[in-house]
Design a protein with these regions (language model features):
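Conserved substrate/cofactor phosphate-moiety recognition/catalytic segment
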Residues: 20-66
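Conserved phosphate-donor/acceptor-positioning beta-strand/loop module used by diverse small-molecule
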Residues: 93-112
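Glycine-rich phosphate-binding loop used to anchor ATP phosphates in small-molecule kinases
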Residues: 52-94
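P-loop (Walker A) phosphate-binding loop of NTP-binding proteins
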Residues: 10
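ATP-binding Walker
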Residues: 13
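Small-molecule kinase domains that catalyze NTP-dependent phosphoryl transfer to phosphate-bearing small molecules
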Residues: 115-157
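Hydrophobic anchor at the beta1->P-loop junction of P-loop NTPases
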Residues: 7
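Walker A/P-loop
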Residues: 16
Length: 164
């Protein structure tokens, strides 16, 4: 049975870095669905209610369940705008969902953003506009990740939870 890992949180939390490390750790037959890549690079659409990114992510999620051992879905993924995606995840993966939410202070996400190669693309004012405090899904239990948990520790924690 295919397993789904969901990584969510505000911009600059570390979702993409953890997702890529997990894909490497799990190896072959691990599908990575990056919300930003699909929305900004593949579709070139804005985020929000009714975004075509949600529809494409649903199709890709279904493909992943049928064809991959592990599917990693990562992104801000606003709990209201992507409700249909989360409902699909529950239908497709049932109890094989491992969901994590980065609950970090704004200052920490800003600090982390400053370490990224693309930090020049947007700054503090944009991050403040996008900020959503404690944007939990509700219908899917999410384990909270805090600033005290480092990259390797996070990857190890998720990997061991999914494998065992």
């Amino acid at each position: 049975m295919s397993k789904l890992i969901i990584l969510r949180g505000n911009s600059g939390s570390g979702k993409t870095t953890v997702a890529k490390a997990l894909q490497e750790r799990f190896g072959a037959n691990t599908m990575l669905l990056s919300h930003d890549m699909i929305r900004r690079e593949i579709l070139k659409v804005k985020d929000g209610r009714g975004t075509p990114a949600c529809t494409l992510l649903i199709h890709m999620l279904k493909y992943g369940r049928k064809n991959c051992e592990v599917v990693i879905l990562e992104g801000i993924l606003d709990s209201e705008c992507y409700q249909e995606l989360f409902e699909c995840a529950i239908e497709e993966f049932g109890s094989n969902i491992y969901s994590y939410y980065y609950d970090l202070p704004f200052e920490e996400t800003l600090r982390r953003h400053g370490t990224k190669p693309n930090c020049h693309e947007f700054g503090e004012s944009a991050m403040r506009r996008w900020w959503k405090e404690k944007d939990f899904i509700g219908s899917i239990p999410e384990m909270v990740l805090t600033k005290e948990i480092g990259l390797e520790e996070t990857v190890d924690l998720i990997y061991k939870t999914v494998v065992y």
